[in-house]
């Protein structure tokens, strides 16, 4: 009896079931413990939304509006496209590290159909989920590569205008995608005026956020921070250009892109939250390296005094 009870407890720990945390209007469509993470797909009939969720019910990794599947459901995904305002031309080559539900690359492909859109995703089960439950479809210009993001960047000969980094999971951060050495590899795959945009799910006052700021500042000439209003997300935009861009210029260029491309997100409004990274820098913060990157510990530790 004791062995049976212990086995039941162990199974619950190793294979957490999302269905116990569902609300009345939610329906579980899919769940699996992949080689890399727990994945569930949940549909909310009241909100008319479908999303990917891990075993913590309040954390969602990607999703769609059922009645408007081309619109971006989450604030961070809308915020990331402010990076377009830091490129002085239309992008022709972009890379997404991390697929999720596929909403961001699909959105980009809709408004820039002539650009090459590469997506690298380590988890083949996530690719399956994006295609089956979120209507993600590859096309001539948009391709998925099942690989580790860092290995792909290290080996590809391509040069990109924008690299979107969105591979940080809600409850686990792959440390090798946070370090100075990794960001140097990303730099090597950017064109001369290229841009990196990174989704950072973090509280403002913890050591992980502090270390990400100083690590990006060491790797790139200019780093800008955008803080979400609806969520805990921050967006970092790092540029190869040595010329600093002021908030008014970001807003003006964002407004032009939004109007010309007829995008359904308020890029100019997002640009209004632009701050230079020095506003967030702490002298005590540690630069993340391949030899020192305790990111999954740091995210639970409060910042030290400035």
Q: Which residues are covered by each model-predicted region?
A:
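Positively charged n-region of N-terminal signal peptides that target proteins for export
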Residues: 1-4
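Bacterial N-terminal signal peptides
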Residues: 8-17
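A generic structural signal for short, solvent-exposed coil/turn residues
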Residues: 13, 33, 44, 109-111, ...
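Soluble small-group transferase modules, centered on the S-adenosyl donor enzyme superfamily
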Residues: 22-51, 55-60, 222-306
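The AdoMet/dcAdoMet-binding core of the Class I SAM-like
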Residues: 45-46, 71-198, 204-207, 213
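Acidic/histidine-rich helix-loop elements
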Residues: 56-70, 172
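C-terminal substrate-binding/active-site "lid" region of AdoMet-derived donor-dependent transferases
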Residues: 185-247
């Amino acid at each position: 009896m004791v062995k049976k009870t212990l086995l039941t407890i162990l199974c619950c720990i190793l294979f957490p079931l999302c269905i116990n945390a569902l609300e009345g209007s939610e329906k579980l469509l899919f769940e699996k413990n992949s080689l890399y993470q727990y994945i569930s797909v949940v549909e909310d009939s009241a909100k008319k939304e479908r999303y990917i969720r891990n075993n913590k019910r309040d954390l969602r990794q990607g999703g769609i509006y059922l009645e408007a599947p081309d619109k971006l459901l989450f604030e961070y995904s809308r915020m990331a496209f402010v990076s377009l305002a830091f490129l002085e031309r239309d992008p022709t080559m972009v890379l997404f590290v991390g697929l999720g539900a596929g909403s961001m690359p699909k959105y980009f492909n809709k408004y820039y159909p002539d650009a090459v859109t590469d997506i690298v995703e380590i988890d083949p089960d996530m690719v399956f989920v994006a295609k089956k439950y979120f209507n993600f479809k590859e096309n001539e210009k948009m391709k998925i590569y099942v690989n580790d993001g860092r290995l792909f960047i290290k080996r590809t000969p391509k040069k990109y205008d924008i690299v979107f980094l969105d591979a940080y999971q809600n409850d686990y951060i792959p440390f090798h995608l946070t370090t100075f050495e990794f960001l140097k590899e990303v730099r090597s795959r950017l064109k001369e005026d290229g841009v990196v945009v990174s989704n950072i799910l973090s509280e403002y006052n913890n050591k992980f956020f502090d270390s990400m700021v100083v690590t990006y500042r060491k790797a790139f000439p200019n780093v800008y921070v955008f803080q979400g209003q609806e969520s805990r997300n921050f967006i970092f935009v790092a540029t190869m250009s040595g010329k600093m861009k002021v908030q008014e210029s970001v807003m003006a260029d964002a407004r032009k892109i939004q109007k010309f491309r007829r995008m359904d997100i308020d890029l100019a409004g997002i640009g209004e939250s632009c701050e230079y990274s020095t506003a967030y820098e702490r002298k005590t913060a540690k630069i993340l390296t391949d030899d020192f990157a305790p990111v999954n510990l740091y995210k639970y530790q409060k910042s030290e005094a400035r």
